[in-house]
């Protein structure tokens, strides 16, 4: 079996509790496969944010095992976490932009930190700002941007480096329906063309049918509902873009 088919992320009987409180996540076992698109849904308090924290390496489980990109997260030394995090793109619900940098420079950060050629940076950022409809705001600092504009900058920054996995927490919460669909198409393009695994947490039930072949992960009181077993098997063949993932 190839590493692709083994999955980017595998949870095995994972539980999470904070301190001595009852578990907020219980007995989670699933696999996120390379090049697949997932929606994470559930009522408020179902555990979505806690699950996302495990996925973007902000939290370790209280029990169980997690493997990501072939690495055992339980036994892996903490000093190796930054390298693993560089393979992730994360859009936080409470995102933060660098206040003294322009929209352009905020989006450029991941590429510049990776040492990318400046010509490539300028071209990539210009394309990304055009995609999210912010070309005219490229030189604006965050304080002068609306909440929705800031969110689009945060999304552009998260996807510009073509991460192996994109994790987005309520990414369309502050934008109008037209822009929400456009952002979803951006995630879909990243998924289809590059092979990025995408996980979008959302309360918007209207989004769930907008991406063909997407899988829905439903959390209920910290447990995952997967009656069809879809989260245990590859949903479709790997795409050409995954070969470099």
Regions found by a protein language model. Name each.
Residues 56:
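Helix-to-loop junction immediately C-terminal to a conserved catalytic motif
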Residues 73-89:
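ABC ATPase NBD coupling module
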Residues 101-109:
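Short coil-to-helix segment of the ABC ATPase nucleotide-binding domain corresponding to the Q-loop/switch region
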Residues 162:
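Conserved catalytic motifs of ABC-family nucleotide-binding domains
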Residues 166-169:
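Catalytic Walker B motif of ABC-type/P-loop ATPase nucleotide-binding domains
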């Amino acid at each position: 079996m190839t590493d692709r088919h083994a999955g980017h992320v595998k949870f095995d009987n994972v539980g999470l509790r904070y301190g001595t409180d009852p578990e907020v996540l219980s007995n989670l076992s699933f696999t996120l496969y390379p090049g697949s698109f997932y929606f994470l849904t559930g009522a408020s308090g179902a555990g979505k944010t806690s699950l996302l924290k495990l996925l973007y390496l902000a939290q370790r489980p209280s029990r169980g095992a997690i493997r990501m990109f072939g690495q055992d997260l339980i036994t892996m030394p903490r000093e190796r976490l930054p390298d693993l995090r560089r393979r992730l793109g994360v859009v936080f619900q409470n995102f933060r932009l660098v206040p003294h940098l322009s929209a352009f420079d905020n989006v450029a950060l991941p590429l510049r930190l990776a040492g990318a050629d400046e010509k490539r940076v300028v071209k990539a950022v210009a394309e990304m700002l055009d995609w999210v409809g912010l070309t005219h705001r490229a030189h604006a600092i965050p304080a002068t941007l609306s909440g929705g504009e800031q969110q689009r900058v945060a999304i552009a920054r998260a996807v510009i480096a073509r991460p192996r996995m994109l994790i987005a927490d309520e990414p369309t919460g502050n934008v109008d329906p037209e822009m929400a669909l456009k952002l979803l198409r951006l995630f879909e393009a990243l998924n289809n063309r590059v092979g990025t695994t995408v996980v979008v947490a959302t309360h918007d039930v209207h989004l769930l049918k907008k991406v063909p072949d997407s899988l829905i992960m439903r959390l209920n009181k910290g447990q995952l509902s997967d009656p069809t077993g879809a989260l245990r098997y590859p949903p479709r063949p790997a795409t050409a873009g995954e070969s470099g993932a």
